C-alpha cells in the first residue's frame, strides 16, 4: 500500500500544575444517585470505575507524557491502576486553596480537562472520574510520584482519612490509584478479568505504541497480558477480521488533521455480508456513531462510485449504494478533537459537525489515491459492492415475489401468526415458539389480549452465511419480518415495531439452544436496535415437574429441583416425590405452559443485552461462521460460564 500521513500525538508545551485544575461544582449526591454518573450499579457500573481511572492515564498518553499503564485485580477484588505520566498535580489549586490532588479526588467536575491548558484532547468529557470512583469506593489510596517525592492520600467513601503527605522518595513520575468498590453501592463487587482485558486491549490498539499490562492476582485465577501495538488501528482492523476471510492483504489506512482535530481510519474488507464499523472519539467508543461515521460513510460511497465510473467498472447510469459499499467492511474510525460534544453522559454519539467535514475531506483525498495506486484491491472492493448491489435488487424482487405469493399485502399477517387484540406496541408481546405442537399449546394458554404467538418450524436459515435476498425468500424468516413490521437492515424502523417484548420460546436442549442462536444472529445482523433497546427476551421453561400427592411444583435447574424436593418432603425425608423431566414445550398442556412460562406474574425471562457490539460480532462469527476450530476453542473456553453467557 502507499504511505499515508500518520497521525501523531503532539506534546502540550505547558506546565501542568494546580492552576490547571478548575473547579466547576462540589461533589454532591454521587452516593445517592450513582447511576447518574456511572450508568448503573450492576456489573457494568462496577467496571466503569476502572475505566474512569484508566481514562485519566490515557489522557496523559494522548498528551504525550505517558507510554505505560498497568491495571491489576488484586486479591479481594481491589483494583490498582498505575501509569508513568507526569503525576496528578500536588501543588495548591488557586480557586480552593487546597492541594490539587485533594481537589481532583473530592470535587466533582474538577480536572485538567476544561480550560484547555492541562489537556488539548481528553476522553473524560465531564471530568467526574476520580471523584466519583472515590465516592463509590469503600476506601481509596492514591500515590503520586512527582518532583522526587511520593505524595499519598487516603479516603473512605469519599471522605479524607489521611491528608496529602510525603511517604518516600522516588526517581520516577506517575500516579498509582488503588481502590475497593463499596459493596453497599453495587450489586456485585467481583471483577471480570476478561471484561477489563478486552477494554484495555481496545485502548492499546487506539494508542499506537502505548504499552498496557493487565494482571489478575486473585488466587486460582492468576493471568496476565501485555499489549502494545505499533500498528495501532491497522492492527485493530486485522484483529477484528481474525475469524473472517479478508479479500485484501493490506489494510487501507488514511489519516489527517486540521487545527486541533485529527482523524485516522483503517479499512479491511472480508468475504462476508455484514458491516462492522467501530468508531471512537478521544478513545471513547461511540456505539451510536455520530458525525465521524456520517462523514466516513458518505465519502466511502462517493469515492467508490467515482472510481468505478472513471475506470469503467460501473457502467452507464449504474451506481452502488452506501449499503452496497459497506458489505463485508471492517473499519476502525478514531478521531481526536478538543471540546468533543457527545450526546448524553454515556458518550454514545459524537455531535461535532466539523468532524464530518474533516473525515469526508481526508477520505476523499486519500482513499482515491489509494485506489489509484492499488487497482487490484480497488477492483476486489468494487466487484463485491456490485455483487451486493445485484443481491439487493434480488432481495427487492424476492420481497415483492413473496408478498404476491403469500398475499402479505395491505397489512395482512402471516398464517403462522396468532395476533393479540391490543394495538399499543408497548403493551404487546410476541412469543416466537419452536414447533407447531408447542405453538398450539401456547395459543390456547396465552392471554390473547396482549400475547401473540408465531410458530417457527423446520430448519432455520443461518443468516451469517446468507445475503438479504435469501432472507426475504426464506419461508421461516419472512413471516417473522412481516409480523414485527419494522423491516430489516437499512430499512429497519423501530418506530414501526408492533411488539415491545419479543420472546424466544424454545426447548431447554441442544436443538432449542441452536434455534435461539440462529434467531439471535438474525436479530443482531439485521435488527440490531431490537437488542440495543432491550426488546428481545428468552423464555426460561422449567426443566422438572415435581409431584407429591396433589401438590405440583416445577424447577428450572438441578439445584432448584433438589431444593424443591427437600421442601416438599418436609419433616419426612422418606416421603415420595415424583420427579419427571420436561422433554419439550410440546409436552406441556396449555395450562402448564401458561403457569410456568407465559404468566407475567410467575414466568422467568432473560433479557438479551448488548454490552459490547465488537465482542458480539466476533462471537456470532465464531459460532455461526465456516471455521470449525475457532468455534470449538470458544465453546471449550466458555463452557464453564454457560449460565452467565450474555450477548
Predicted regions and their residues:
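Helical (often loop-to-helix) elements that flank the catalytic cores of nucleotide-handling enzymes
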Residues: 94, 341-355, 554-560, 564, ...
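Conserved short strand/loop->alpha-helix "switch" segment adjacent to the catalytic nucleotide/phosphoryl-transfer site
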Residues: 32-51
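GHKL-family ATPase ATP-binding module
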Residues: 1-19, 27, 49-51, 59-61, ...
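A short glycine-centered beta->alpha linker in the GHKL/HATPase_c
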Residues: 87-92
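C-terminal interaction appendages of subunits in large macromolecular complexes
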Residues: 390-409, 424-429, 440-446, 459, ...
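Short adenine-binding "F-helix/F-box" segment of the Bergerat
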Residues: 93-94, 101
Amino acid at each position: 500500500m502507499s504511505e499515508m500521513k500518520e497521525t501523531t500525538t503532539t506534546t502540550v508545551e505547558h506546565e501542568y500544575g494546580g492552576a490547571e485544575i478548575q473547579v466547576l461544582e462540589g461533589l454532591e449526591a454521587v452516593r445517592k444517585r450513582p447511576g447518574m454518573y456511572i450508568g448503573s450499579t450492576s456489573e457494568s457500573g462496577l467496571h466503569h470505575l476502572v475505566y474512569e481511572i484508566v481514562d485519566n492515564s490515557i489522557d496523559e498518553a494522548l498528551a504525550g507524557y505517558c507510554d505505560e499503564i498497568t491495571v491489576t485485580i488484586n486479591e479481594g477484588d481491589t483494583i490498582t491502576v498505575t501509569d508513568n505520566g507526569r503525576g496528578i498535580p500536588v501543588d495548591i489549586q488557586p480557586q480552593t486553596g487546597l492541594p490539587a490532588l485533594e481537589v481532583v479526588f473530592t470535587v466533582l467536575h474538577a480536572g485538567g480537562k476544561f480550560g484547555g491548558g492541562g489537556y488539548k484532547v481528553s476522553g473524560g468529557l465531564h471530568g467526574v472520574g476520580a471523584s466519583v470512583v472515590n465516592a463509590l469506593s469503600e476506601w481509596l489510596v492514591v500515590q503520586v510520584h512527582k518532583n522526587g517525592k511520593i505524595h499519598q492520600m487516603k479516603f473512605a467513601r469519599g471522605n479524607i482519612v489521611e491528608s496529602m503527605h510525603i511517604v518516600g522518595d522516588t526517581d520516577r513520575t506517575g500516579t498509582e490509584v488503588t481502590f475497593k468498590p463499596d459493596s453497599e453501592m453495587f450489586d456485585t463487587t467481583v471483577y471480570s478479568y476478561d471484561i477489563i482485558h478486552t477494554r484495555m486491549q481496545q485502548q492499546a490498539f487506539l494508542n499506537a505504541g502505548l504499552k498496557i499490562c493487565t494482571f489478575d492476582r486473585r488466587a486460582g485465577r492468576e493471568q496476565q497480558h501485555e499489549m502494545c501495538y505499533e500498528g495501532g488501528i491497522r492492527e485493530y482492523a486485522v484483529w477484528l477480521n481474525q475469524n473472517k476471510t479478508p479479500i485484501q492483504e493490506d489494510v487501507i489506512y488514511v489519516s489527517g488533521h486540521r487545527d486541533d482535530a485529527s482523524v485516522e481510519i483503517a479499512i479491511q474488507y472480508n468475504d462476508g455480508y455484514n458491516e462492522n464499523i467501530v468508531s471512537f472519539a478521544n478513545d471513547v467508543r461511540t456505539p451510536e456513531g455520530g458525525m465521524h461515521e456520517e462523514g466516513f460513510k458518505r465519502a466511502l460511497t462517493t469515492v467508490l462510485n467515482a472510481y468505478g465510473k472513471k475506470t469503467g467498472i460501473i457502467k452507464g447510469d449504474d451506481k452502488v449504494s452506501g449499503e452496497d459499499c459497506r458489505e463485508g467492511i471492517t473499519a476502525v474510525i478514531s478521531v481526536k478533537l478538543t471540546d468533543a460534544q457527545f450526546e448524553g453522559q454515556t458518550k454514545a454519539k459524537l455531535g461535532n459537525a466539523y468532524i464530518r467535514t474533516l473525515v469526508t475531506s481526508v477520505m476523499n483525498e486519500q482513499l482515491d489515491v489509494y485506489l489509484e495506486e492499488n487497482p487490484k484491491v480497488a477492483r476486489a472492493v468494487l466487484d463485491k459492492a456490485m455483487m451486493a448491489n445485484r443481491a439487493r435488487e434480488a432481495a427487492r424482487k424476492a420481497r415483492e415475489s413473496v408478498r404476491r405469493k403469500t398475499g402479505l399485502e395491505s397489512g395482512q399477517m402471516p398464517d403462522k401468526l396468532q395476533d393479540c387484540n391490543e394495538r399499543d406496541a408497548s403493551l404487546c408481546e410476541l412469543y416466537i415458539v419452536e414447533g407447531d405442537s408447542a405453538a398450539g399449546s401456547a395459543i390456547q394458554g396465552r392471554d390473547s389480549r396482549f400475547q401473540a404467538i408465531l410458530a417457527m418450524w423446520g430448519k432455520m436459515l443461518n443468516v451469517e452465511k446468507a445475503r438479504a435476498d435469501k432472507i426475504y425468500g426464506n419461508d421461516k424468516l419472512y413471516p417473522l419480518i412481516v409480523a414485527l413490521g419494522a423491516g430489516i437492515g437499512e430499512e429497519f424502523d423501530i418506530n414501526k415495531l408492533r411488539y415491545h417484548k419479543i420472546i424466544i420460546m424454545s426447548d431447554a436442549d441442544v436443538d432449542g439452544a441452536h434455534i435461539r442462536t440462529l434467531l439471535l444472529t438474525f436479530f443482531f445482523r439485521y435488527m440490531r436496535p431490537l437488542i440495543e433497546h432491550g426488546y428481545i427476551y428468552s423464555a426460561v421453561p422449567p426443566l422438572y415437574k415435581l409431584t407429591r400427592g396433589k401438590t405440583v411444583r416445577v424447577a428450572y435447574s438441578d439445584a432448584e429441583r433438589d431444593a424443591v424436593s427437600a421442601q416438599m418432603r418436609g419433616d419426612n425425608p422418606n416421603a415420595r416425590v415424583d420427579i419427571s423431566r420436561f422433554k419439550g414445550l410440546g409436552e406441556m398442556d396449555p395450562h402448564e405452559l401458561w403457569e410456568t412460562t407465559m404468566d407475567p406474574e410467575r414466568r422467568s425471562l432473560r433479557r438479551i443485552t448488548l454490552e459490547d457490539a465488537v465482542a458480539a460480532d466476533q462471537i456470532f462469527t465464531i459460532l455461526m461462521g465456516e471455521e470449525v476450530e475457532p468455534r470449538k476453542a470458544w465453546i471449550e473456553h466458555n463452557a464453564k460460564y454457560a449460565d452467565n453467557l450474555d450477548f
